[in-house]
């Protein structure tokens, strides 16, 4: 994928370590009882020293207001914690359904704060706020500062929103409202790692002491090591694991060998 400033052009081939994909799936979910069972099964299978972070998102309903959405976030978080989650990731990098002009929930700081507050007062496990990219370092600082009271840490960057076209210049996804999609994978690293570095710089300056979990374009072990050396508390991968399910195992092997 050729990832440009305002658009991305889809390519059909990808090699391990450089895969970048566009995602336009909406926000589908199985019924709560189904994914609660998945969480329990996952918790039973994790090993010593591992933790299970469960990401939750509220579902807007036709005619629903902010309170309805906030309550759904909290309900999902409570069910996830009851099912065995060691930490809750509150997914705020999703469209804000209460505004006409496109923005994400994390950009609506009062709404994001209410969601985090309700979640934090619902569960006893750590709460992480998942964020997307910010237009300026100042916006990042102001948002993180205002949300810090209700979050144990931040996870960023979820994805990069772009208009996506095929190699003939036509929209890559059929249907109204799908001109823009979430771009994830290797080529988002430049943007995502810069956002993480800015978050770490504000923390080092004493703005707040919350954990910073890096995600976005971390497609190689070398990138993971670099981000951790910069000060991130943890590295998360998603697209990389689709192409390399043993990514984490290889990371641990290389780190162990380096120490030895």
Can you name each region flagged by the protein language model?
Residues 1-12, 164-181, 228-229, 234, ...:
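C-terminal helical cap(s) of enzyme catalytic domains, especially alpha/beta-barrels
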Residues 68-71, 75, 135-149, 201-205, ...:
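Catalytic cores of alpha/beta
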Residues 29-33, 70, 186-193, 221, ...:
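Electropositive phosphate-/nucleotide-binding environments in soluble metabolic enzymes
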Residues 1-146, 172-174:
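Active-site entrance/lid segments in N-terminal catalytic domains of soluble metabolic enzymes
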Residues 92-107, 143-210, 250:
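Glycine/Thr-rich beta-alpha phosphate-binding loop at enzyme active sites
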Residues 45-47, 121-125, 149, 203-208, ...:
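Short helix-capping segments at alpha-helix termini
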Residues 92-94, 150-163, 217-218, 224-251:
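Glycine-rich phosphate-binding active-site loops on the catalytic face of alpha/beta enzymes
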């Amino acid at each position: 994928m050729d990832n440009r400033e305002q658009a991305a052009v889809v390519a059909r081939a990808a090699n391990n370590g450089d895969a970048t994909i566009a995602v336009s799936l909406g926000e589908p979910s199985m019924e709560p009882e189904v994914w609660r069972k998945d969480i329990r099964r996952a918790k039973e299978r994790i090993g010593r020293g591992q933790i299970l972070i469960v990401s939750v998102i509220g579902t807007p309903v036709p005619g629903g207001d902010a309170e309805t959405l906030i309550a759904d976030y909290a309900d999902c978080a409570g069910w996830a914690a009851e099912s065995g989650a060691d930490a809750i990731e509150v997914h705020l990098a999703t469209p804000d359904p209460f505004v006409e002009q496109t923005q994400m929930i994390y950009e609506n700081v009062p709404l994001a704060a209410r969601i985090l507050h309700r979640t934090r007062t619902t569960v006893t496990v750590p709460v992480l706020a998942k964020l997307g990219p910010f237009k300026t370092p100042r916006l990042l600082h102001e948002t993180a500062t205002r949300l810090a009271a209700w979050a144990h840490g931040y996870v960023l960057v979820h994805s990069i929103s772009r208009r996506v076209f095929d190699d003939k210049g036509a929209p890559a996804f059929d249907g109204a409202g799908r001109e823009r999609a979430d771009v994830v994978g290797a080529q988002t690293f430049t943007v995502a790692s810069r956002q993480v570095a800015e978050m770490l710089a504000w923390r080092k300056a004493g703005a707040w002491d919350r954990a910073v979990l890096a995600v976005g374009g971390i497609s190689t072990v070398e990138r993971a090591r670099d981000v951790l050396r910069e000060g991130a508390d943890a590295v998360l991968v998603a697209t990389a694991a689709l192409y390399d399910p043993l990514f984490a195992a290889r990371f641990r092997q290389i780190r162990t060998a380096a120490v030895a």
